[in-house]
Amino acid sequence: MFKIKYCLRLLTIILLFNFAAINQVNGQAPLTNKYGLFVVKDSKVLQQEIKLDSNKQMVDLKRQIPGLVLDLKYATEDNFMHQKLYPPVHTTFLRKPAADSLRKVVEELKKQHLTIKIFDAYRPYSITEKMWEKVKDDRYAADPSKGSGHNRGAAVDLTLIDPDTKKEMHM
């Protein structure tokens, strides 16, 4: 149990570090949305930012981490909103540094005969707004005026599972 707690703490620290690195300002005049949150609204601008900083690249977790188990709750009605928020999807995404860190944690967990099941990773900003409309409590949903690690591709909702049985660990 100590090793599991250690791995989860390590994952949290790594993801928080990457989240901070991802959110550094590149000297570009930012745009704000209706909440005053700085956003990139033009895909061409985003592509330019990725060329300047590959850490902003979003990567497909199924390709980045072979064997990763996904149970994307917001593509089903099995979530706190009790409705499908995403179309049926078969993968999800994270920024490259977060995905690299997650891959390292999965490799360490394999030594303990465990792996990770992902419930959610990258989340479109529009979904954050829908969640906030239903639950205006930042203990349970991200305040759209701040955005979230999910919106930035730097957060995952997950649990640990046995890789053979796919049974979730009690946590």
Task: Briefly describe each language-model feature range.
Residues 1-30:
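Bacterial Sec-dependent N-terminal signal peptides
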Residues 26-119, 134, 138-171:
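Extracytoplasmic cell-surface/polysaccharide-interacting catalytic and binding patches
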Residues 124:
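Segments that shape or occlude catalytic/ligand-binding pockets
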Residues 127:
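Short, well-ordered surface patches within globular domains
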Residues 131:
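Short active-site loop/helix that positions an aromatic residue
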